Amino acid sequence: MVFAHLNLLRKIVGIIGNFIALCLFLSPTPTFVRIVKKKSVEEYSPIPYLATLINCLVWVLYGLPTVHPDSTLVITINGTGILIEIVFLTIFFVYCGRQKQRLIISAVIAAETAFIAILAVLVLTLQHTTEKRTMSVGIVCCVFNVMMYASPLSVMKMVIKTKSVEFMPFWLSVAGFLNAGVWTIYALMPFDPFMAIPNGIGCLFGLAQLILYGAYYKSTKRIMAERENQPGYVGLSSAIARTGSEKTANTNQEPNNV
């Protein structure tokens, strides 16, 4: 009876975790809307999205019935995450504007795909029980899950240096913290160290980001206001409008050679 109730509670927490994880995957959407509008990635980094992609790939492998049975919720949300990250990285690739950065993104995605393919072949052919496969893939999941939660460290360093959270999306930090918290609870029913350890660490990283956001939110507004009030500052929309006007004027001044 107790086991049945615990199993039901675990499923409920897992469904909540799936919803929050979906919010986590979608939380950078305003960032990418901004990128598309400005046609530039500015100072945003592709690292969090590359880290999330490899994390989703290894968790899909972990959730396969031949690796870790009864993990449908793990497969569905991480499969969805893969599709979302591919869309985000495609947008980043189009608007990054630097060929070197595009090559790096392409190389990392190719390396991640090759790694998962090799890992899947080795685990499924060399290990013949789900317990051994769970152990092997679970360790890899731990590593990449921690990497995903730690990926904003470079952004956090920039926040401390510039005293501005402009390029650290708030909702991404909130969703990351909540996602790690819910999946930590899920991993305790029953205890799954491969989910509990990285998500517990993820809670700490998410909390650190929220503390930074609270500490530098006011200074960010002040810095942005000062920048916009500088005599030489021209907003993107103004610059585009001015460029268009200049082109029209130049066209009208050209002699008709027809």
Curated annotation (Swiss-Prot):
Residue stretches making up the MtN3/slv domain: 12-100, 136-221
Residue intervals on the Extracellular side: 1-11, 68-73, 124-134, 188-193
Induction comment: Induced by the pathogenic bacteria P.syringae pv. tomato.
A Gene Ontology molecular function term of the record: sugar transmembrane transporter activity
An example Gene Ontology CC term for this record: plasma membrane
Entry keyword Transmembrane helix: yes
Location relative to the cell: Cell membrane
Keywords tagged on the record: Cell membrane, Membrane, Repeat, Sugar transport, Transmembrane, Transmembrane helix, Transport
Family matches, as InterPro entries: SWEET (IPR047664), SWEET_rpt (IPR004316)
Membrane topology: Multi-pass membrane protein
TM spans (from-to): 12-32, 47-67, 74-94, 103-123, 135-155, 167-187, 194-214
Regions of this protein lying in the Cytoplasmic compartment: 33-46, 95-102, 156-166, 215-258
Pfam families given in the database record: MtN3_slv
Job of this protein: Mediates both low-affinity uptake and efflux of sugar across the plasma membrane.
PANTHER family: BIDIRECTIONAL SUGAR TRANSPORTER SWEET6-RELATED, RAG1-ACTIVATING PROTEIN 1
The family this protein is said to belong to: Belongs to the SWEET sugar transporter family.
Subunit note: Forms heterooligomers with SWEET8, SWEET11, SWEET13, SWEET16 and SWEET17.
Protein name stated in the entry: Bidirectional sugar transporter SWEET7
Lineage of the organism: Eukaryota, Viridiplantae, Streptophyta, Embryophyta, Tracheophyta
